[in-house]
Amino acid sequence: MSMTKINWYPGHMKKTKDMIKENMPLIDIVLEVVDARIPLSSKNPDIPKFAKNKKRIIVINKADLVTKEEINFWKKFFKENNFADEVLELSAETGFNMRALYSIIDKVSAEKKARLMAKGLRKVNTRLMIAGIPNVGKSRLINRIVGKNSAGVGNKPGFTRGKQWIRIKEGLELLDTPGILWPKFESEEVGMNLAITGAIKDEILPIDDVACRLLDKMMEMNMKNILKEKYKLLDEDFDQVTGAIIESIANRMNMRQKGNTLNVQQATYTVLRDYRNGKLGKFGLDRDLAETMINDYK
């Protein structure tokens, strides 16, 4: 599949990019949210370009959807390659490890306050920007930080519209930004990983190809047994191309439509939805990119 089929950079993303650049001089801390299943593919390479000389925190969200070993690999990777000042895993959905994030934010805020008050300033505000790609969990994270539903929450890419300044507490303000991708993905694999995890709208995707690529990856990781158990597949179902395996899933799960024909589209969306919801096991998709793509993201 060519990259052009899965690029998604509508006009509002260009406007958001310009807005982020415009507001960056006001910001003290840039908190970039990435998806634990695709920490590198979900890391917008434009953010470091905008955030030079800022305190940078990478939050690996959705940590509950991968193994601890996977998390440790990416924390070490980001730290050793100087991607950020701090790297932290959490789950905005469950609240896991939120206290650690609060501590980091408070520490950076206190450092700025002490520095400026030593110069005679009496009132010091710290401003935090939350940035990331669509559907990575920014709004849920903000709700955790603020403690109320001030940002709204959606489970589709592109939910948050326009910038939002949110007062967290005295002396600490947060700028929420809509999720943005970038004009051209560095590789076909990056685009495909974004599509598999739901960062790109399904409506514009060659969805059959996306589901097939997910199954290919699961085969490469020897995860056939999970598919067998989840979808009642037999060994013989795997002696065929992945497109036919999806047909077998429709057959074994009795997914049928008018005329009693197999509903392959239902099977396709079911496989993707199950992975996105963590029902096909805890695993990531990005390991192969760690060495080959590193310079594109720093």
What are these regions (language model features)?
Residues 64-131, 150, 255:
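Canonical P-loop GTPase G-domain recognition
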Residues 100, 104, 140, 213, ...:
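Alpha-helical scaffold segments in soluble metabolic enzymes
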Residues 1-29, 37-38, 43, 50, ...:
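Helix-rich effector regions associated with P-loop NTPase G domains
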Residues 92, 142, 172-175:
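Conserved active-site beta-strand-loop modules that form the wall/rim of enzyme catalytic pockets
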Residues 127-147, 151, 177:
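Glycine-rich phosphate-binding P-loop
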Residues 48-50, 74-77, 147, 190-194:
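Glycine-rich, phosphate-binding/catalytic loops in enzymes
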Residues 112-116, 143, 149-155, 221-226:
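Short, structured loop/turn "capping" segments at alpha-beta junctions
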Residues 32, 58-60, 130:
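Structural beta-sheet core signal
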